[in-house]
Amino acid sequence: MSHTEPKAPVNTGEVENGHLYDGSGTEDDPFIVEFQKDDPGNPMNWGQSRKWFIAAIATLSVFAVTFTSSAYSVSANEVFKDFDISTEVFIVGLSLFVLGFAIGPAVWANIGLRSELYGRQILWIITHIAMVAFLGGSAGSQNVATLLILRFFAGTFGGSPLVNSGGTIADLFPPAQRGLALTIYCVAPFLGPILGPIVGGFVSESVGWRWVQGVCVIFIGVVGILGIVFIPETYGPVLLQRRTHQLAKADGKIYVSVLEKNQGKKLPSEVFKRALFRPWIFLFLEPIVLIASVYMAIIYGTVYMFMGAMPIVYNEDRGWSVGIGGLAFLGIAVGIIFGLVYAIWDNNVRYMKLFAAKSANPESRLPPAIVGGVALPIGMFAFAWTNYPSIHWSVSIILSAPFGFGCVLVILPIMNYLIDTYTIYAASVLAAAAIFRSVVGAVFPLFTTQMYHNLGIHWASSIPAFLTLLCMPFPLIMYRYGEAVRMKCKYSFEAAEMMRKMQLQQTAAATTTEKDKDSSSE
């Protein structure tokens, strides 16, 4: 049986009278609330300009946080003067910030601040305010302990955009459009750490390390305000849940969301437990997530390894100043930009043709990763063995570009692949990948200085190159056998079945609506 929403004086902002829901409105047969065709309450049906503006702010937040994590890394000489500490202690400030990216989501899950229960908007507000507060405090630190602790807490809250922003983009764009949006979004966690030292180096050299933190406070604060003003709630299950409450309040009948019907009603304690443990379940019990996360973590760790490696290669060995030394990251930055251009071209030319022909599957995302998997070790080995002081500095910087190029072409397709594979579990999968890569990103800088001094700049730079060489077959293997693997993994299979059911229900609802329109016209 179908039901037309009552014309109650409820200003919901999303609910529109005339939508048809299956059910009878009773305890045994509640109305099933779901997004209808062209439903204005569905974020995927919002205007393109609005969606892209929201996506741009979410992406800028990720860039700001990762920029902040690395801008600190070139302030060593200034911090040494104020606190009389060793290089190892200084590097801890970088590692603790990145470690916060991993710990943050688990902490919020434990205290109940999870997007799956309350939505993404509240997380944005709380975490950006907290980041500004802790970074502002770190700028005024009077001892190194305060500096390290406050940077850790800033990073803990900074982990929110890394996970939450990706979920926001998945909320806004269907698979046909999501590739381009995620292409731009996924560049931010890698371009931010690369550009941070360039800006931070000149700021530190000119006005001191405290203003490096100050610039980051201003940056994150402005982005946070933009998000508070312009980004509404986008998480579909929360929007549907709110709609069920509004409809029930309007006419007193029983409504449940389609996701609640399919998965069952969850108590807050169950949601918290799931949010705390599910990323780890995905990470260790889903082979696709584990292998993909390891690959991305190696790349991410290498990016942060460069925070300690570049000053050794160019500042110590070549005598460059702090500001000029930051420019050594330009080669990787240019490679990232070229990778972004290639990824956009591939999405528009190759993937969209497959999608239009209805022959695209998650594995269709992976061909660029095969190219990127080859570019990564080439760039890293080239950088490692051309950074002799006797070879002109421009050679090693130019040859580091393939590493940046490969970063984009490996990370972007894998992220899209995980989202397309796990759909309704995408937030938890992205959280698992983010947690793991953040832990690795925090660990790599801790041994970078000793590794470069003990092994030398050539062999030390070659170690992560060998690791990426080991991972190189993964995209090719998954491209060839991924579909069979997905069907054997519990959660990827469950996600596929859930999406199939939801699509069938939406098709049936659309058919019913068309029949009702035809009947009324007669």
UniProtKB/Swiss-Prot annotation:
MF GO annotations: transmembrane transporter activity
Q: Source organism's superkingdom?
A: Eukaryota
Might you report a single GO cellular component term?
Answer: plasma membrane
Where does the record place it? Membrane
Please report the record's description of how this protein sits within the membrane. Answer: Multi-pass membrane protein
Effect of a null allele: The production of sorbicillinoids shifts mostly towards tetrahydrobisvertinolon.
| Membrane-traversing stretches | 52-72, 89-109, 121-141, 143-163, 183-203, 211-231, 280-300, 324-344, 366-386, 395-415, 427-447, 457-477
Q: Which UniProt keywords apply?
A: Membrane, Transmembrane, Transmembrane helix, Transport
Q: Which PANTHER family match?
A: MAJOR FACILITATOR SUPERFAMILY, MULTIDRUG TRANSPORTER, PUTATIVE (AFU_ORTHOLOGUE AFUA_3G01890)-RELATED
Q: Describe the function of this protein.
A: Major facilitator-type transporter; part of the gene cluster that mediates the biosynthesis of sorbicillinoids, a diverse group of yellow secondary metabolites that restrict growth of competing pathogenic fungi but not of bacteria.
Q: What is this protein called?
A: Major facilitator-type transporter sorT
Q: Which organism is it from?
A: Penicillium rubens (strain ATCC 28089 / DSM 1075 / NRRL 1951 / Wisconsin 54-1255) (Penicillium chrysogenum)
The organism's lineage is: Eukaryota, Fungi, Dikarya, Ascomycota, Pezizomycotina
